[in-house]
Amino acid sequence: MGASDFDAQPDATMGVLPVVDARGAYVVPGLIDIHSDYVENVASPRPSVVMDLSTSLYKADRELVSHGVTTIFHSLSVYGAHVFDHKPIRDFGNVSALIDRVAALRAGEERDHLIRHRLHMRVELDSVDLYDDIESFLRSGKVDLVSFMDHTPGQGQYRDLLVFGDTLKGYRDVSDEDVRDIVRQQQESQKLTYAQITALAAVARERGVSIASHDDDSEDKLAFMDGLEATISEFPISLDIARAARARGMHTIAGAPNVMLGHSHSGNLSAREAVQAGAIDVLCSDYYPAALLDAVFTLRDQCGLDIAKAFALVTINPAKAAGIADEVGSIAVGKRADVLLVREISCGEGESSGEHPGARPDGRAARTMPVVTRAFVGGRSVFRSHYPDQPLGYGRDPEQLVSLDQLTRPLAKAV
């Protein structure tokens, strides 16, 4: 949306954003991350350690806004079995406690924390014994997005059993025979039935909870999830499946780290290729919040994607996917004023999201990266950072510019 879309005379009585010097910056909507388990890493910095959960959410709140995230969907997983490793933070007791604490943060939105907190409940199909708990949470109003996952080896993300085995060995000291036993156990384990999944999806729809599929690898799975009125396909396995999901009107999600790495960490769909093909329309941070903003500029500089289209992948498109586009996702009259100032700064030499030949005195390419220098949530300033090479006065409020002007005048000699 351009400046011409707004009245040129702002109404100061409406309590809108203060006038801020944004020279040289991109003025963009706050980023919306609908799949992130980052809070697990904050709460559990070591596999056997679980820190205070409320404090961890507030710590994550501060870190996420520094990366431009103004709406976060904490992705908390409900598992029946822990195949790769056992993380106490993913025990159902801790997951339940986190769900309650996220709901409490939402109740205090724009008052006692910095960004908007939402809940994405990830349901693994082996969570048979937790069915009643899952249904209860869906009815509670604490869940904003639910996804159904199946990490059984031989399909989905691990349709290649060699990839599953290599991944498992990266977590645990197991032999090839152990891997075969685990594959057999997982394939034979009890799963939620189609009837149970259908019933949970009906509760979700009744409560206005968005529904997502996960690791889609076939037209049949897409058809089933489409029948449940799922609006999102997370991490489709191939370009053909991503295109098929889009053809059904589903939003398709890939990980921003995939964009940064240039490939999937598990050997599946390349996010860069899929975005360029129009088969992916949403990026999420997955496990690395810093990648969201970096991915936008990587797509611009290394893939030739228009910067506005790149930003849409992390703003308005995820807002539409999660059903919150009437509130956030774009800078528009009537929406919440979640706004960022983003600037590219020099950070040495070499590969980067942006290469600018001749920017250095020696004529070599300067490495740049995007940074958030100011963030507003609901029209309130919640974050500010300053780098030495920013223009004097950049990002400051008008009343501060007077004193800056005085500071730049030559000092009079004492007589």
PLM feature spans:
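His/Asp/Glu-enriched, well-ordered alpha-helical/loop segment
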Residues: R248-N258, G262-V342
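A general structural motif
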Residues: K191-T193, S213-D215, S233-A242, L261-N268
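Histidine-rich, glycine-flanked metal-binding segment
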Residues: M1-V28, P388
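Active-site microenvironment of metallo-dependent hydrolases
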Residues: R62-S66, T70-T71, G141, F297-D301, ...
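Glycine-enriched alpha-helix->loop->beta-strand junction motifs that scaffold or abut catalytic
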Residues: S140-D144, M225-I232, A247-I253, G278-D281
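Hydrophobic faces of well-ordered beta-strands that scaffold small-molecule active sites
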Residues: G30-I34, I72-H74, I115-M121, D144-D150, ...
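Metal-coordinating catalytic core of metallo-dependent amide/deamination hydrolases
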Residues: Y79-D216
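Metal-associated gating/positioning segment near the N- to mid-region
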Residues: A22-S96
